[in-house]
């Protein structure tokens, strides 16, 4: 493998950031693959996602020039490249997007000039190989390319509305049907005449000759609902350039999979799968998917059967299936991680830090899927063999998904390789039939949202609740109901009240929202039943008006329920101590996956791969209580994000942090946290774990209580201990020894009982042999055996079969009014003429029972009564009829 040294992927990445740093840009880290505070988006799929609120006017940033390298994923939802990965030159699930941004600072001139400078001077691309496109009415960009940069007119292409509507063009970008939008200019690289394909805008534009490198978007308009464009007061620049695609050009290779980064991964995949041909497409799939899976796990996604976890699971299983195609039958995929870290760990230190967690998660998924893949492939082959029209029925695809864990994408992938397809409509119909009725919407308020237009007119809510639980002069700035915005509300109405300031904590970070009251001097009273955060910055008081009325502009006083807030604070601080203890006991792979901090309990979900033993549970509980008794001062500081991380503070998955963060320190625990806490750890009083369980693959859950709730739990447990001691005639101090003696005695009695049963069966066998009836040289035994359970009955049957070479046997064990039936057919004379399952059905129906089995053995049951005797007495006659 010849890996170029001048423009390695790593160097291209650092060149880009250094270039824009020197142009006055602040370099920001990649946002997580899971978007913060954006439920509409499954994954971060472009560089602009983390700045979406800035463009919408819902967030303001202090810096006006920003550059980054954004990790992106396109493997689910609207933006899904999964099916194409491995089969095309440039499709990936995971990719890196280089981007520079201007928020009301520089505009077209600088963006175009710097893009050209970086491409031609830093990366030395020949200018004659570059071609640019502009929106057909964007004369300003056209002139800048021609007059300032010097691009010949025959290499500047105007692109019109080529998507069937006004301003619907490859060169006109818009976030949605309304809102920020504007023209864009794209830079293409010309691979030369020897590669098929035409320039952008031509009939041959889909060929591989001209490859898009960089897209510069100029957001200068606000699109109205009637389609008109209104100039934005502060135009913005949003650019994006795919790192892998650029690396292929700078390294003089044709496909992204030939660049240095991918070649290293492909060689490792070839080594793990023992494949000599490194051009094998399956190696490309494995290499690509190793990046997507590792970064998803690092960003807190774990395999599951829904949402983002399901997407991760199907990517993993697609990689494993390609390994299976190459003949691999043992876990291998997790061993891609060290090589991935070697090529990307310097740029993304979080990858190195989470190496153990990533490998263990992948290994667990490999072991789980190996159990079903072989069986699932056999079923697929059976289905495919019966298909005449090349379409796999949706019902069969659903059966593979529902029973064997095959994502339908995987089934479709296999089908496509065989020239077939899946009936997706039929699959969706089966899914709809299977899916349970969606849960009713939660309590009022959670589905109500604030429009972006209205949010842009408001300032973020000022939170007063760290220092005070009661506040006056809270001005109502917005009212929302199920119908949306409203100007006023009256008695009995349920509304969400937004005020300019508030002492009420809004639910976030797992901590429940505050409750309490909002009041006015004229007697108006609202009962606040919850507080929710809207758009990440507005506190919405979910309330019911119990007296008077309220309107926008009113001034209220607010009082938080003090006792409840204190109990919540106890549990929140205890959660921090628990998190710290878990990482101390199990290692740094332990990361919070979710939490609930309520007044009566806390729930903490965390990454770990095996159940916690009783000894470990005791150790964790003791460590937390040691910190409680140490009575540490809970220190809270505001500092810059990077300074906080440098100080060892833990940032939690799924949380969105600003430039300045709140750091909560208690003892050895240091976390970024916006929640409410106690003053000293001693305020917790007592910490007690009440349960531990697994909630999904690689995720455990601990539930615990603190303070008075913990004391009440201990007292209740003690009361149960005394009750148990009383039931066995012991005392609390000696109850364990007493129970051990009782269980030992029980085991002794059970062994003695088994011996007695054996003797009883031996005697019974002798009696049964003596009562056997000869029917056409076949011995027929039909008998009632009182006191024998199913196990003893089968043992008696097996002993009889050993002593009767040709026999038909029916035994009825009777205990407590219930009958257990077993039948057997043994030997060449009876086999083929008498069937055990048919005989059992004949007997069982006479005693209101049923059963089933094979031709040589069957079992079932029924009810005791007079009919049992007649049923058994008739067996010999029934056998005789069938033998003849």
Curated annotation (Swiss-Prot):
The record's free-text note on cofactor binding: Binds 1 zinc ion per subunit.
Q: What are the record keywords, sorted? A: Aminoacyl-tRNA synthetase, ATP-binding, Cytoplasm, Ligase, Metal-binding, Nucleotide-binding, Protein biosynthesis, RNA-binding, tRNA-binding, Zinc
Entry GO MF terms: alanine-tRNA ligase activity; aminoacyl-tRNA deacylase activity; ATP binding; tRNA binding; zinc ion binding
Q: Where does Zn(2+) bind?
A: 572, 576, 673, 677
Q: Which GO terms describe its cellular component?
A: cytosol
Provide the protein's localization.
Answer: Cytoplasm
Q: Which residues form the signal peptide?
A: none
Enzyme Commission number, as recorded: 6.1.1.7
Lipid biosynthesis in keyword set: no
The cofactors it requires, by name, are: Zn(2+)
Note the PROSITE patterns from the entry. AA_TRNA_LIGASE_II_ALA
Q: Which InterPro entries match?
A: aa-tRNA-synth_II/BPL/LPL, Ala-tRNA-lgiase_IIc, Ala-tRNA-ligase_IIc_anticod-bd, Ala-tRNA-synth_IIc_core, Ala-tRNA-synth_IIc_N, Ala-tRNA_ligase, Ala_tRNA_ligase_euk/bac, DHHA1_dom
**KW Repeat (keyword) present:** no
Superkingdom per UniProt: Bacteria
Recorded catalytic activity of this chain's protein: tRNA(Ala) + L-alanine + ATP = L-alanyl-tRNA(Ala) + AMP + diphosphate
One GO biological-process annotation of the entry reads:
alanyl-tRNA aminoacylation
- Read off the PANTHER family from this record: ALANINE--TRNA LIGASE, CYTOPLASMIC, ALANYL-TRNA SYNTHETASE
Q: What is known of its domains?
A: Consists of three domains; the N-terminal catalytic domain, the editing domain and the C-terminal C-Ala domain. The editing domain removes incorrectly charged amino acids, while the C-Ala domain, along with tRNA(Ala), serves as a bridge to cooperatively bring together the editing and aminoacylation centers thus stimulating deacylation of misacylated tRNAs.
Q: Which family does it belong to?
A: Belongs to the class-II aminoacyl-tRNA synthetase family.
Q: What does this protein do?
A: Catalyzes the attachment of alanine to tRNA(Ala) in a two-step reaction: alanine is first activated by ATP to form Ala-AMP and then transferred to the acceptor end of tRNA(Ala). Also edits incorrectly charged Ser-tRNA(Ala) and Gly-tRNA(Ala) via its editing domain.
Protein name, entry field: Alanine--tRNA ligase
Q: Which organism is it from?
A: Xylella fastidiosa (strain Temecula1 / ATCC 700964)
């Amino acid at each position: 493998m010849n890996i170029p040294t001048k423009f390695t992927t790593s160097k291209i990445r650092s060149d880009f950031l250094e270039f824009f740093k020197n142009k006055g840009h602040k370099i920001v880290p990649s946002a997580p693959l899971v978007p913060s505070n954006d439920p509409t988006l499954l994954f971060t799929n472009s560089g602009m996602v983390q700045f979406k609120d800035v463009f919408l006017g819902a967030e303001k940033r202090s810096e006006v020039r920003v550059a980054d390298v954004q990790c992106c994923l396109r493997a689910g939802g609207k933006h899904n490249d999964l099916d194409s990965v491995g089969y095309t030159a440039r499709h990936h699930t995971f990719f890196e997007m280089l981007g520079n941004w201007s928020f009301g600072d520089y505009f077209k001139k600088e963006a175009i000039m710097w893009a050209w400078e970086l491409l031609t001077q830093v990366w030395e691309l020949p200018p004659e190989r570059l071609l640019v496109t502009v929106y057909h009415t964007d004369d300003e960009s056209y002139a800048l390319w021609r007059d300032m940069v010097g691009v010949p007119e025959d290499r500047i292409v105007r692109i019109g509305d080529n998507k069937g509507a006004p301003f619907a063009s490859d060169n006109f970008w818009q976030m949605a049907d309304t809102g920020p939008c504007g023209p864009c200019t794209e830079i293409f690289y010309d691979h030369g005449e020897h590669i098929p394909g035409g320039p952008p805008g031509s009939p041959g534009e889909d060929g591989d000759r001209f490859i898009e490198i960089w897209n510069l978007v100029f957001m200068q308009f606000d699109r109205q609902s009637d389609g008109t464009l209104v100039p934005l007061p502060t135009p913005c620049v949003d650019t994006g350039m795919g790192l892998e695609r650029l690396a292929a050009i700078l390294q003089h290779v044709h496909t992204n999979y030939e660049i240095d980064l991918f070649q290293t991964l492909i060689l490792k995949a070839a080594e793990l799968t023992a494949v000599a041909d490194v051009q094998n497409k399956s190696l490309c799939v494995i290499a690509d998917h190793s990046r997507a899976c590792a970064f998803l796990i690092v960003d807190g996604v774990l395999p599951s059967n829904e949402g983002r976890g399901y997407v991760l699971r199907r990517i993993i299983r697609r990689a494993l299936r390609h390994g299976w195609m190459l003949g691999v039958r043992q876990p291998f995929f997790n061993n891609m991680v060290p090589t991935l870290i070697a090529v990307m760990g310097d740029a993304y230190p979080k990858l190195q830090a989470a190496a153990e967690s990533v490998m263990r998660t992948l290994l667990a998924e490999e072991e789980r899927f190996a159990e079903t893949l072989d069986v699932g492939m056999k079923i697929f082959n059976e289905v495919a063999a019966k298909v005449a029209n090349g379409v796999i029925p949706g019902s069969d695809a659903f059966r593979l998904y529902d029973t064997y864990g095959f994502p339908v994408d995987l089934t479709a992938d296999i089908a496509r390789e065989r020239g077939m397809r899946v009936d997706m409509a039929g699959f969706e119909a089966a899914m709809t039939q299977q899916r349970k009725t969606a849960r009713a919407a939660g309590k009022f308020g959670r589905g109500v949202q604030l429009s972006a237009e209205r949010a842009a007119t408001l300032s973020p809510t000022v939170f007063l609740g760290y220092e005070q639980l009661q506040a006056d002069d809270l001005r109502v700035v917005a009212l929302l109901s199920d119908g949306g915005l409203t100007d006023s509300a009256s008695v009995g109405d349920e509304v969400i009240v937004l005020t300019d300031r508030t002492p009420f904590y809004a639910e976030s970070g797992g901590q429940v929202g505050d409750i309490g009251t909002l009041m006015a001097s004229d007697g108006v009273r609202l009962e606040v039943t919850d507080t929710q955060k809207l758009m990440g910055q507005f506190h919405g008081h979910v309330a019911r008006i119990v007296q008077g009325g309220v309107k926008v502009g009113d001034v209220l006083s607010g009082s938080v329920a003090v006792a409840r807030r204190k109990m919540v604070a106890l549990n929140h601080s205890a959660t921090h101590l628990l998190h710290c203890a878990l990482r101390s006991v199990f290692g740094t792979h332990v990361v919070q996956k979710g939490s609930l901090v309520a007044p009566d309990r806390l729930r903490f979900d965390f990454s770990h791969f095996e159940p916690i033993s009783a000894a470990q549970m005791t150790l964790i509980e003791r460590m937390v209580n040691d910190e409680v008794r140490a009575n540490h001062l809970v220190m809270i500081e505001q500092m810059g994000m990077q300074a906080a991380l440098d100080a060892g503070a833990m940032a939690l998955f799924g949380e969105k942090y600003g430039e300045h963060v709140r750091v909560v320190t208690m003892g050895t625990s240091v976390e970024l946290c916006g929640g409410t806490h106690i003053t000293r750890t001693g305020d917790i009083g007592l910490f007690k774990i009440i349960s531990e369980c697994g909630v999904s693959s690689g995720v455990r859950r601990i539930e615990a209580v603190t303070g008075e709730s913990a004391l009440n739990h201990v007292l209740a447990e003690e009361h149960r201990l005394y009750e148990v001691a009383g039931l066995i005639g012991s005392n609390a101090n000696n109850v364990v020894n007493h129970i051990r003696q009782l269980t030992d005695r029980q085991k002794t009695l059970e062994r003695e009982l088994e011996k007695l049963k054996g003797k009883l069966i031996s005697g019974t066998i002798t009696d049964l042999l003596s009562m056997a009836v000869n029917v056409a040289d076949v011995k027929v035994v039909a008998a009632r055996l009182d006191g024998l359970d199913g196990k003893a009955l089968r043992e008696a049957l097996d002993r009889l079969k050993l002593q009767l070479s040709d026999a038909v046997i029916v035994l009825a064990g009777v205990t407590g009014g219930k009958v257990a039936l077993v039948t057997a057919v043994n030997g060449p004379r009876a086999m083929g003429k008498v069937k055990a399952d048919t005989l059992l059905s004949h007997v069982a129906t006479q005693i209101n029972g049923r059963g089933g089995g094979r031709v040589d053995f069957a079992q079932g049951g029924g009810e005791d009564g007079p009919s049992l005797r007649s049923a058994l007495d008739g067996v010999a006659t029934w056998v005789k009829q069938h033998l003849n």
